[in-house]
């Protein structure tokens, strides 16, 4: 083997070892499309971590998990995950009929042991949607059953998250267009771009809090479960540097049903 081939082999081997050593982030949602909450953060971190997603339900409200609705929702979730570089996993709870029972918690605990995530990102625990509250309660119990101690971050959902304390604001301006692409993969839920419009309003509000003197920024809000021990870094410390804002966005109040971002 000549020196050129030897160097090339060594480089490939090193790259493979680095890829294998990458830590994991697990996002937990109640339904296919709840990824729209932390999409920006996931996109910002996907080059440093392996991102996985677990949905407790398959999105077929009060229908069976093998219904056409469930198949459509799962297909859209897979398409969204492909755009975001995420590996999806699906639970078997019924949409609108989800329960945080022992079997449910043990199934997720098994996945947690396999993935050993550095961080778990989930719904805030007080939420207008009962499936969201169930998913967070079951996840916290599953983490205990798995014997793990990952960082836990809660993400914000439009109007559904109730009284969530905001500990972190993450600037997602650089990946906003990519977030829109991911949201639009949920075709049956994003009717008339309603989810895009809602996330745009949320993002502009949080962006104005993060950068009061700089119009045009978009941000996501997060709450943490508990302070990390001294010397242990949050995944938020791996966020890439922000790019300069080229041109402030012109924001117009949307009319009912109006698409405000294209």
Where are these regions (language model features)?
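Active-site environment of divalent metal-dependent phosphoester hydrolases
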Residues: 34-35, 60-63, 96, 126-132, ...
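Sec-dependent signal peptide recognition
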Residues: 1-9
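The feature marks non-catalytic terminal segments
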Residues: 149-151, 155-262
């Amino acid at each position: 083997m000549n020196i050129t081939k030897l160097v090339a082999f060594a480089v490939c081997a090193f790259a493979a070892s680095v890829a294998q050593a990458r830590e994991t982030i697990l996002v937990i949602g109640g339904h296919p499309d709840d990824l729209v909450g932390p999409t920006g953060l996931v996109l910002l971190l996907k080059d440093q971590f392996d991102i996985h997603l677990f949905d407790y339900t398959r999105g077929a409200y009060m229908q069976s998990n093998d219904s056409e609705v469930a198949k459509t929702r799962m297909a859209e979730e897979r398409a969204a995950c492909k755009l975001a570089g995420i590996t999806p996993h699906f639970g078997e709870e019924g949409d609108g009929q989800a329960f945080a029972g022992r079997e449910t918690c043990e199934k997720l605990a098994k996945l947690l042991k396999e993935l050993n995530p550095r961080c778990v990102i989930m719904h805030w625990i007080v939420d207008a949607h009962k499936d969201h509250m169930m998913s967070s309660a079951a996840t916290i119990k599953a983490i205990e059953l798995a014997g793990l101690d990952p960082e836990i971050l809660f993400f914000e959902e439009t109007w559904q998250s109730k009284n969530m304390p905001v500990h972190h604001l993450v600037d997602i301006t650089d990946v906003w267009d990519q977030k829109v692409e991911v949201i639009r993969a949920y075709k049956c839920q994003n009717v008339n771009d309603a989810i895009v419009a809602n996330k745009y309003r949320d993002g502009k509000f949080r962006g104005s809090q993060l950068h009061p003197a700089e119009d045009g920024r978009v941000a996501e809000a997060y709450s943490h479960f508990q302070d990390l021990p001294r010397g242990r870094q949050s995944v938020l410390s791996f966020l890439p540097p922000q790019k300069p804002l080229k041109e402030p966005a012109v924001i117009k109040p949307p009319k009912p049903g109006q698409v405000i971002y294209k």
